[in-house]
């Protein structure tokens, strides 16, 4: 009871920090996950150190303090004896109990009863386990016999493992062959599509020529009729002038003239009807929606017992699993491709390595004029499609709408501050933004590196709040659905939640959770906050620019302060984060991560797994955001621009 009461008062978070590796988030053990001490005093498991040491040259960089431990082998590092003592003490009583005699529990066993399957000491064997009812033998002999049995089973399992590996290799060969066939069919479809486009272009040219001939013929008839109408109009005007002159004559002269003049018929030569050519569109040769072709399935049998040799297997295969066929096939043969499993589609796309997001255009270039950037470091998109960019090199926040540049926000000191600084000949304070976000109330939150503060502006550029209390080095900022701002404190190791009023400034602030060097932060529609931990460095950051230092792993916390989903440094067997420099969450709750050292944009679905959205075209991505219309904006720091990509992923179901 006393032990249970003592266990109930343990701080589980503190115990987790001591007994878990902060990189792989696995508990320390005395073997593979043995705790090792770096020269800086931090503890990392042996398995993670092996991976870090294999990918480095000069030593191991601590993910917490960035100090380098210069070693060439793990034997140069000492064990953390304190952690090992805790592990050994926690399992001491259980381990000792497992070693004792099963009968009395007080003496070490020397005999093994094969009939009962228990280990016994000599007194217990002589008392209760005598032959012929029991078959006993020394523990060492029984153990050797059991080891021989296990050795035989191990040999059979290894043979089975080898067979499974061969089958797996054959399956990979089949997968490569299928991918090649898919691409070939897609290329064939593209050729057929281009041929039909050429046919459509020729058909349009012929159609427009025929339409032009009809238009020319009708124009001649209309022009001839217009000519006759103009002549009749001139004659009518001439007769009007003639009669006006007659009306103005004197009475005697008017009466003396002969009145037997006949009135000419002006409209006699005008045709009553016009013969024109009417035109209408007659659809020929096609009924229903236009389709280039359809994917047709054929049965195909692959012998998994035989070895599969990639291209040789593809060349020797007699029938294809998917073929391209023209639209003149029978309806029974049609099998639309969308019936394929979403999970299989996902795996095939990941294997093909095709970039999922297409580049559309880029916005901005290096400069100081409106719409230009100089080392931009943060990006945010509002619900009204307004884009906010933290332009660090130009000491400003730029706001863009759908039409282009809208306005900029700079730091404007008070009158007395400006007067005193100008009088003393000092430089005026600048706004050095590190991160920017806007809440649902239209307030813009900015973390300022100039004085390590949180500043809140209106859209008009008026500063309504400036908060420095409890903040050592504020960096990342995001806005919760409730309108609160969440700010990360890199040196303080905390995430702070601020409630800001437009008239009163910061009215409430509290600590959301603690973390190891949290830097970049984002949140989803439910209020779950994702933040980076540790310290990852961009390998090309030769000038030690702090804004190019990123995260080492990703953690999450709910609005109630409960820790949630974690993505460790080694997010895959052969993949790891190098320098996380930006994050955002899409409408489905999937996490999108920008790694400035990998120069890639990674996608982590809510149900698990990962994929690479953008592999090429980026020099140093430091910020990402999604627009309401489904476009992915990537802020490229060293290219001084915002690059716009398409983002319309297929909605896969979780397998």
UniProtKB/Swiss-Prot annotation:
<keyword id="KW-0863">Zinc-finger</keyword>
<feature type="coiled-coil region">
    <location>
        <begin position="139"/>
        <end position="198"/>
    </location>
</feature>
<feature type="repeat" description="NHL 2">
    <location>
        <begin position="417"/>
        <end position="460"/>
    </location>
</feature>
<dbReference type="InterPro" id="IPR013083">
    <property type="entry name" value="Znf_RING/FYVE/PHD"/>
</dbReference>
<dbReference type="GO" id="GO:0000209">
    <property type="term" value="P:protein polyubiquitination"/>
</dbReference>
<feature type="modified residue" description="Phosphoserine">
    <location>
        <position position="330"/>
    </location>
</feature>
<dbReference type="GO" id="GO:0033554">
    <property type="term" value="P:cellular response to stress"/>
</dbReference>
<keyword id="KW-0833">Ubl conjugation pathway</keyword>
<dbReference type="GO" id="GO:0001894">
    <property type="term" value="P:tissue homeostasis"/>
</dbReference>
<dbReference type="GO" id="GO:0050769">
    <property type="term" value="P:positive regulation of neurogenesis"/>
</dbReference>
<dbReference type="GO" id="GO:0045087">
    <property type="term" value="P:innate immune response"/>
</dbReference>
<dbReference type="GO" id="GO:2000786">
    <property type="term" value="P:positive regulation of autophagosome assembly"/>
</dbReference>
<dbReference type="GO" id="GO:0061630">
    <property type="term" value="F:ubiquitin protein ligase activity"/>
</dbReference>
<keyword id="KW-0963">Cytoplasm</keyword>
<dbReference type="GO" id="GO:0070534">
    <property type="term" value="P:protein K63-linked ubiquitination"/>
</dbReference>
<comment type="pathway">
    <text>Protein modification; protein ubiquitination.</text>
</comment>
<comment type="function">
    <text>E3 ubiquitin ligase that plays a role in various biological processes including neural stem cell differentiation, innate immunity, inflammatory resonse and autophagy. Plays a role in virus-triggered induction of IFN-beta and TNF-alpha by mediating the ubiquitination of STING1. Mechanistically, targets STING1 for 'Lys-63'-linked ubiquitination which promotes the interaction of STING1 with TBK1. Regulates bacterial clearance and promotes autophagy in Mycobacterium tuberculosis-infected macrophages.</text>
</comment>
<dbReference type="GO" id="GO:0006511">
    <property type="term" value="P:ubiquitin-dependent protein catabolic process"/>
</dbReference>
<dbReference type="GO" id="GO:0045666">
    <property type="term" value="P:positive regulation of neuron differentiation"/>
</dbReference>
<dbReference type="GO" id="GO:0003713">
    <property type="term" value="F:transcription coactivator activity"/>
</dbReference>
<protein>
    <recommendedName>
        <fullName>E3 ubiquitin-protein ligase TRIM32</fullName>
        <ecNumber>2.3.2.27</ecNumber>
    </recommendedName>
</protein>
<dbReference type="GO" id="GO:0005776">
    <property type="term" value="C:autophagosome"/>
</dbReference>
<dbReference type="GO" id="GO:0008270">
    <property type="term" value="F:zinc ion binding"/>
</dbReference>
<dbReference type="GO" id="GO:1903265">
    <property type="term" value="P:positive regulation of tumor necrosis factor-mediated signaling pathway"/>
</dbReference>
<dbReference type="GO" id="GO:0000045">
    <property type="term" value="P:autophagosome assembly"/>
</dbReference>
<keyword id="KW-0862">Zinc</keyword>
<dbReference type="Pfam" id="PF01436">
    <property type="entry name" value="NHL"/>
</dbReference>
<dbReference type="GO" id="GO:0032897">
    <property type="term" value="P:negative regulation of viral transcription"/>
</dbReference>
<dbReference type="InterPro" id="IPR001258">
    <property type="entry name" value="NHL_repeat"/>
</dbReference>
<feature type="binding site">
    <location>
        <position position="104"/>
    </location>
    <ligand>
        <name>Zn(2+)</name>
    </ligand>
</feature>
<dbReference type="GO" id="GO:0045862">
    <property type="term" value="P:positive regulation of proteolysis"/>
</dbReference>
<dbReference type="GO" id="GO:0042594">
    <property type="term" value="P:response to starvation"/>
</dbReference>
<feature type="zinc finger region" description="RING-type">
    <location>
        <begin position="21"/>
        <end position="66"/>
    </location>
</feature>
<dbReference type="GO" id="GO:0048147">
    <property type="term" value="P:negative regulation of fibroblast proliferation"/>
</dbReference>
<dbReference type="GO" id="GO:0016567">
    <property type="term" value="P:protein ubiquitination"/>
</dbReference>
<dbReference type="GO" id="GO:0010994">
    <property type="term" value="P:free ubiquitin chain polymerization"/>
</dbReference>
<dbReference type="GO" id="GO:0045787">
    <property type="term" value="P:positive regulation of cell cycle"/>
</dbReference>
<dbReference type="GO" id="GO:0030335">
    <property type="term" value="P:positive regulation of cell migration"/>
</dbReference>
<dbReference type="GO" id="GO:0004842">
    <property type="term" value="F:ubiquitin-protein transferase activity"/>
</dbReference>
<dbReference type="GO" id="GO:0006979">
    <property type="term" value="P:response to oxidative stress"/>
</dbReference>
<keyword id="KW-0808">Transferase</keyword>
<feature type="binding site">
    <location>
        <position position="129"/>
    </location>
    <ligand>
        <name>Zn(2+)</name>
    </ligand>
</feature>
């Amino acid at each position: 009871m006393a032990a249970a009461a003592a266990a109930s008062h343990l701080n589980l978070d503190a115990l987790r920090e001591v007994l878990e590796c902060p990189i792989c988030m696995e508990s320390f053990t005395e073997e593979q996950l043995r705790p090792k001490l770096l020269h800086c005093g931090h503890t990392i498991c042996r398995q993670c150190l092996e991976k870090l040491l294999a990918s480095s040259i000069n030593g191991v960089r601590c993910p917490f303090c960035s100090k380098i431990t210069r070693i060439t082998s793990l034997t140069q590092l000492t064990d953390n004896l304190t952690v090992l003592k805790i592990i050994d003490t926690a399992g001491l009583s259980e381990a000792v109990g497992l070693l004792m005699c099963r009968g009395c529990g007080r003496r070490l066993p020397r005999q093994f009863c094969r009939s009962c399957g228990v280990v016994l000491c000599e007194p217990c064997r002589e008392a209760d386990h005598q032959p012929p009812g029991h078959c006993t033998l020394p523990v060492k002999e029984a153990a050797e016999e059991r080891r021989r049995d296990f050795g035989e089973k191990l040999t059979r399992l290894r043979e089975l493992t080898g067979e499974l590996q061969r089958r797996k290799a054959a399956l990979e060969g089949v997968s490569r062959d299928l991918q090649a066939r898919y691409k070939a069919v897609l290329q064939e479809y593209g050729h057929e599509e281009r041929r039909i486009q050429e046919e459509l272009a020729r058909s349009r040219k012929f159609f427009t020529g025929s339409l032009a001939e009809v238009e020319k013929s009708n124009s001649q008839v209309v022009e001839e009729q217009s000519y006759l109408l103009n002549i009749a109009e001139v004659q009518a005007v001439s007769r009007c002038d003639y009669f006006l002159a007659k009306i103005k004559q004197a009475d005697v002269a008017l009466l003396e003239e002969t009145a037997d003049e006949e009135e000419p018929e002006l409209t006699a030569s005008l045709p009553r009807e016009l013969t024109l050519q009417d035109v209408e569109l007659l659809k020929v040769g096609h009924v229903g929606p236009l389709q280039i072709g359809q994917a047709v399935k054929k049965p195909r049998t692959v012998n998994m017992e035989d070895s599969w040799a990639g291209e040789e297997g593809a060349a020797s295969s007699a029938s294809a699993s998917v073929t391209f066929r023209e639209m003149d096939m029978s309806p029974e043969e049609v099998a639309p491709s969308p019936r394929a499993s979403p999970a299989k589609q996902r795996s095939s796309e990941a294997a093909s390595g095709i970039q999922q997001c297409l580049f559309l255009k880029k916005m901005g270039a290096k400069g100081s004029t409106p719409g230009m950037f100089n080392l931009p470091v943060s990006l945010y998109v509002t619900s009204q499609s307004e884009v906010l960019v933290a332009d660090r090199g130009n000491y400003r926040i730029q706001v863009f709408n759908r039409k282009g540049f809208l306005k900029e926000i700079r730091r404007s000191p008070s009158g007395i501050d400006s007067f005193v600084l100008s009088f003393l000949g000092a430089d005026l304070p600048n706004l050095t933004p590190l991160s920017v976000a806007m809440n649902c109330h239209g307030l813009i939150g900015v973390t300022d590196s100039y004085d390590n503060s949180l500043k809140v502006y209106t859209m008009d550029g008026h500063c309504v709040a400036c908060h420095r209390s409890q903040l050592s080095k504020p960096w990342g900022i995001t806005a919760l659905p409730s309108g609160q701002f969440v700010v990360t404190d890199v040196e303080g190791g905390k995430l702070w939640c601020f409630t800001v009023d437009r008239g009163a400034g910061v009215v409430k602030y509290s600590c959301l959770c603690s973390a190891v060097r949290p830097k970049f932060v984002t949140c989803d529609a439910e209020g779950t906050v994702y933040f980076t931990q540790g310290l990852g460095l961009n390998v090309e950051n030769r000038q030690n620019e702090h804004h190019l230092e990123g995260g080492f792993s990703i953690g999450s916390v709910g609005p109630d302060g409960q820790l949630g989903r974690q993505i460790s440094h080694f997010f895959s067997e052969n993949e790891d984060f190098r320098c996380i420099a930006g994050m955002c969450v899409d409408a489905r709750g999937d996490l999108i991560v920008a790694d400035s050292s990998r120069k890639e944009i990674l996608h982590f679905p809510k149900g698990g797994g990962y994929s690479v959205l953008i592999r090429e075209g980026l020099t140093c991505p430091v910020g990402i955001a999604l627009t309401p219309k489904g476009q992915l904006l990537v802020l490229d720091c060293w290219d001084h621009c915002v690059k716009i990509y398409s983002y319309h992923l297929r909605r896969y179901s979780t397998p």
